[in-house]
Amino acid sequence: AILLVSPGSVGWLLDDLESTPVVQPAKLKNADAIVILGGGARKYAPEFGGQTVNRLTLERLRYGARLAHRSGLPVLVTGGAPSDSQPEGALMKTVLEEDFRVPVKWVESRSLDTRENAAFSAEILLPAGVRRIVLVTHAAHMRRSVEAFEHAGFEVIPAPTAFFGDRGASDDALPGLPGMNAAFAGSYAAHEWLGLLAYRVSR
């Protein structure tokens, strides 16, 4: 367990996952659309009238909105939900349009994982002639996401966001010691490595 909370170990786990560079503005000109992946929802958000996106999804939406404002590209949001919840895609559309003033052209709301994000987005976008996409997700999630979307038939321009920076420890009160941020980053990185392995084995 200490492997997942030690800042040095977290850095080792994240090095390859977060190796994709920040997207350059010139690359946006070559894209057909922006695709933003959901990262979860908050079921209890009474201040927002019921449910809303969680922090991970909000980080992705914020950066996706920034890219949309800069480029004018149309946006697809993708994310489903268990049967007792609102689909992430619908929640993401609400946040983008009401809070960031970014219109959402397409909503994919059936997917429950990254592979389905890609497959169901392809069902919407490829028939519309959209093949070259700017893909927005967490930097540590980008490697697995690119593989899934390329396998689904897209040409992907990665647009990573929400880097863990100093390996998840920079916000801790005592950065040299294991802390909550490092623990979260380590858990996230381990999840991504396991997801990559499972994806490649089952492909």
List PLM regions with ranges.
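A structural signal for short, hydrophobic/glycine-enriched beta-strand patches
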Residues: L3-G186
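A transmembrane-helix-recognition feature enriched in membrane-embedded lipid enzymes
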Residues: W12, D16-L17, G186-R203
